[in-house]
Amino acid sequence: MWVSIFNLKSSGLNHFCTRTKAFRYFWCRTFSLASLSENNSRFQTDSSRLPYSGSRYYHSSSKHFGEDFVSILKNIDVPRDCVETIRNVLVKHNWIQKYESGFSTELDQYTVIRILDDLFEETLDASIVLYFFRWSELWIGVEHSSRSISRMIHILVSGNMNYRAVDMLLCLVKKCSGEERSLCLVMKDLFETRIDRRVLETVFSILIDCCIRERKVNMALKLTYKVDQFGIFPSRGVCISLLKEILRVHGLELAREFVEHMLSRGRHLNAAVLSLFIRKYCSDGYFDKGWELLMGMKHYGIRPDIVAFTVFIDKLCKAGFLKEATSVLFKLKLFGISQDSVSVSSVIDGFCKVGKPEEAIKLIHSFRLRPNIFVYSSFLSNICSTGDMLRASTIFQEIFELGLLPDCVCYTTMIDGYCNLGRTDKAFQYFGALLKSGNPPSLTTSTILIGACSRFGSISDAESVFRNMKTEGLKLDVVTYNNLMHGYGKTHQLNKVFELIDEMRSAGISPDVATYNILIHSMVVRGYIDEANEIISELIRRGFVPSTLAFTDVIGGFSKRGDFQEAFILWFYMADLRMKPDVVTCSALLHGYCKAQRMEKAIVLFNKLLDAGLKPDVVLYNTLIHGYCSVGDIEKACELIGLMVQRGMLPNESTHHALVLGLEGKRFVNSETHASMLLEEIIVAKWHLTSGG
């Protein structure tokens, strides 16, 4: 199938060329680029235009390319030497021929490959070839064939532009969607358009590495064995990356088989390979096997390095074995290895995370370690978790005094600390400082701020941060949406809750349990209890089991309005779903009975719950006590207070307030004093009873 880039004969391309404004834009934009050798970064791979591996042929098309070409060359802002070089090579090899008022040639995939070869042979500059490759695709108006792309990839690698080859191959892998047949076609085209064996080995290694990057580990493994049929094996770095993924996805057995295959193909074991196995053993909890392999490295002729020991130390710390990690750290010198900041920082971070900063400080002094950002981040995390933000801000300032610059993690830690205390004003001060520092806020940073603003009533600030996240191109997740949704729910903006759910679905984000909890709670608070109940029913019909919290909200809503029949239907529905109501669920139902002053029903339910193994808390007892006091049954209320004390729970202000209300209903004088005396008598009596006095 033929394409003319100069003679306007094809009706298909005729239509394309009639869109003159769009066409001139692409044309001028292409030729107004700066020198390719200076600005290669401008040729970023556009995944929306990169050819699919299945595009093995051009569509039939042609285009006039005569005097317009000359006039554009005269008027566009482009380095003359680059354009002249391409033009001269095309003329030299007769790709541009005199044809009436212009020049003419015909292009198909084979012709494109030959032109690419001629350009590279004459210039030895892969960037110039890439320039023509990109321009020709825009000019033709159809995607390049898989073979043309394959040849371009070989030229890029030959011209030391591997990073551009990575862009192209990565896009091909994405377009193939992991289909073995499509990737095999790509591999076939790469093999058939090879330049020399050295380049082919590099290209196949890049292809396999791209599969690994896309987490297509099975495909990467299959391609490895397929290229082995050509006598080619991936580079050492790619083998290590693939081995790491095999260990992550498939485990030790397949990883051992792959290592044996590596050895049979001339790849040798090294510390990096064995460190991956040490990491896997430790991640699975087999620290004894990890240590055995670490100590047995010498049997393979390999000396353990600081990286291998750091892997082992780090895994010990993350598993909570800080004493053992510290011991290994101090023994490193026995193996002729000096501790570095990474190995020491791992243990310091471990101590900080378990709330032992004093042990971390001892290590810093022992190894005379100059604190780095990672160490400071660990200390800040520990201090902020205690709520001591004054001390945390002092530590934060020390970072600057040492000549270090806080990273996004440090700023986010401070922001989170202030948000937990409700100090959103201080949190925004650090957020502003983060923006001024040039560090872009992470998804976590902004999500924390939105959550705090939603909790503490600054919904407009939460919306502002949310809009800024979308402007900055951050990929929002379900937690971000849930945090803002929570704020809308608290401010009774139910319409915006539904709008956010629609936006989530449009963005391809599936609502989770927390999303539905927020939605149902918001509806119950606004009084839409029946509608909330319908949502629960619909979720169950779709196979989604709502949480206990969602059931509790609706049960509480039904109970408050006195609709105990519907409340109990949901209660028994929970049992059918093998969900056990918790104390909060029971409190919601009992609160409804107490509010309706149906205390005989309330106490029967309470006793049944006790028999079923429920462990009531102070809130549940106070609910019943308040109910009995409201109907004037002070004696029964005192009996429940005694039972509560007997179970190890002391009365609180809510208990005292319930008694006061009950005594006032009985027209007692000095009801507050009398209530205090009653509580004291009950506590003393129960104390004597339990102590045997």
UniProtKB/Swiss-Prot annotation:
Q: Transmembrane stretches, by residue range? A: none
Where would I find the PPR repeats?
Answer: 200-234, 235-269, 270-304, 305-339, 340-370, 372-406, 407-441, 442-476, 477-511, 512-546, 547-581, 582-616, 617-651
At the top level of its lineage, which domain of life is listed? Eukaryota
Q: Which UniProt keywords apply?
A: Repeat
User: Which InterPro entries did the record assign?
Assistant: Pentatricopeptide_rpt, TPR-like_helical_dom_sf
Is Nucleotide-binding one of the keywords? no
Gene3D superfamilies in the record? Tetratricopeptide repeat domain
Name the family the entry cites. Belongs to the PPR family. P subfamily.
UniProt-listed PANTHER family? PENTATRICOPEPTIDE REPEAT-CONTAINING PROTEIN 3, MITOCHONDRIAL
The record ties this protein, via NCBIfam families, to: PPR
Which protein, by its recorded name, is this?
A: Pentatricopeptide repeat-containing protein At2g19280
Organism, as annotated = Arabidopsis thaliana
